[in-house]
């Protein structure tokens, strides 16, 4: 069973990280091509392209300038411990055991606009380049065109290594679009998290993101190997609703205490 998640805009390159074996990201040749494109952008260009403040644009212009193809523990950190958004709050990588992280290395992948696909212990340098960014490049008008079939093929290889042909899609639509689902040989399960607010169950973005991370944590800590085991997920107060679920879309509901 393989789970895929989105990256996060919020990064942590300051706090201490446990001592794990680390690896070079697989697609640095591709990353380098994107960096070359990004280095031609002014702070004003970047601010407009990414809809970010001048301050953030300046920070990321500096990041692109400093980025190097050689990743080491001085300029990088393992992806699992670098991302700090809502999904990663739920995942809470810092509290995972060494055995958990080793399991995650085989069963979890992170999609990335710059790196394509990352394993948890792959090194990464600080960056901001969301998959939906309309960054014109030698291969087309955006990052979906740039990555083409590369990410899909890498995901398939990771699925093949599992031996059960199951993919758990915990990524956002923006990132999952980089995976060409119709080209995958896999049973794809999409968990959906609904919260009851004002008497109606619906997706609430903040809660849903955190729940995706909780599901990753559950999968990792319980060493899940069977689709049916996913239905037992109960972290954060969620419960599996069989009546609302289908064979490929697993619906989990929760009641928010006002």
UniProtKB/Swiss-Prot annotation:
One GO CC annotation: cytosol
A Pfam family of the record is: H2O2_YaaD
One of its GO biological process terms is: response to hydroperoxide
Which family is it part of?
Belongs to the UPF0246 family.
This protein is called what?
Answer: UPF0246 protein NTHI1156
Question: Source organism lineage?
Answer: Bacteria, Pseudomonadati, Pseudomonadota, Gammaproteobacteria, Pasteurellales
């Amino acid at each position: 069973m393989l789970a895929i998640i989105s990256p996060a805009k919020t990064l942590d390159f300051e706090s201490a990280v446990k001592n794990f074996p680390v690896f070079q990201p697989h697609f640095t040749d591709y990353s380098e091509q994107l960096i070359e494109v990004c280095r031609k952008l002014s702070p004003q260009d970047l601010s407009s392209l990414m809809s970010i403040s001048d301050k953030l644009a300046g920070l990321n212009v500096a990041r692109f300038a400093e980025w190097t193809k050689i990743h080491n523990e001085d300029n990088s950190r393992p992806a699992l411990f670098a991302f700090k958004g809502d999904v990663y709050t739920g995942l809470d990588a810092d509290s995972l055991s060494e055995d958990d992280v080793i399991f995650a290395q085989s069963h979890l992948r992170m999609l990335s606009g710059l790196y394509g696909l990352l394993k948890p212990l792959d090194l990464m340098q600080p960056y901001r380049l969301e998959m939906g960014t309309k960054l014109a490049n030698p291969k087309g008008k955006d990052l979906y065109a740039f990555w083409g079939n590369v990410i899909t093929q890498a995901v398939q290889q990771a699925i093949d290594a599992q031996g059960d042909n199951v993919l758990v899609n915990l990524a956002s639509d923006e990132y999952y679009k980089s995976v060409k689902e119709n080209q995958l040989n896999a049973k794809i399960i999409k968990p959906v998290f609904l919260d009851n607010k004002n008497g109606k169950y619906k997706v609430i973005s903040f809660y849903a993101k955190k729940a995706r991370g909780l599901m990753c944590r559950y999968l990792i800590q319980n060493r899940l190997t069977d689709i049916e085991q996913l239905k037992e997920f109960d972290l954060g107060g969620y419960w599996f609703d069989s009546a609302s679920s289908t064979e490929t879309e697993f619906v989990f509901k929760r009641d928010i205490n006002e």
